[in-house]
Amino acid sequence: GMSGSCTVKTCWMRLPSFRSVGDALKDRFDGASRVMVSNTDLEAPTQRNDAAPHRAPRRERYKLKLQPHNPDHKSPGSKDLVYLEPSPGFCEKNPRLGIPGTHGRACNDTSIGVDGCDLMCCGRGYRTETMFVVERCNCTF
């Protein structure tokens, strides 16, 4: 027979962890392709005289054709990250772009991160400085 109880299952979308999103973005960033915009297929959106405004879908609004900067590379896919110009170098000072450069900055010679000497000094080499610091430890015996 019938009973007065029932089971309900509810499903919902859940975001992945911040770490996994960051890792995926970093992978795409590392594999980004330099492209050129080909204006041979460029078309301005068509104007309509309807009373109701018409917007073409974003993908079709401007038919930009992205071609790889290097002709030996394949064209980027819809999920690939692309860039038009390389980033400026941050190793050398560039006042016009507000880049102070990395000369004279303190680095950590044991780190493999962005504060590490190998990365921060851009392969120029670096001087090490050993310091002995005496501090009071307020120890009690």
From Swiss-Prot:
Main location: secreted
Function as written in the Swiss-Prot or TrEMBL entry: Segment polarity protein. Binds to the frizzled seven-transmembrane receptors. This protein is probably a growth factor.
Pfam families on file: wnt
Glycosylation sites: 108, 138
Post-translation changes: Palmitoleoylated by porcupine. The lipid group functions as a sorting signal, targeting the ligand to polarized vesicles that transport wg to unique sites at the cell surface. Depalmitoleoylated by notum, leading to inhibit Wnt signaling pathway.
Protein name, UniProt field: Protein wingless
Chain positions covered by the region annotation Disordered: 40-61
Example GO BP: canonical Wnt signaling pathway
UniProt gene name: WG
Disulfide bond positions: 107-122
Subcellular location(s) of the protein: Secreted, Extracellular space, Extracellular matrix
Higher taxonomy: Eukaryota, Metazoa, Ecdysozoa, Arthropoda, Hexapoda
GO molecular function, one term: frizzled binding
Biased composition (Polar residues): 40-49
Lipid tethering residues (O-palmitoleoyl serine): 3
Family: Belongs to the Wnt family.
UniProt keyword terms in alphabetical order: Developmental protein, Disulfide bond, Extracellular matrix, Glycoprotein, Lipoprotein, Secreted, Segmentation polarity protein, Wnt signaling pathway
GO cellular component, one term: extracellular space
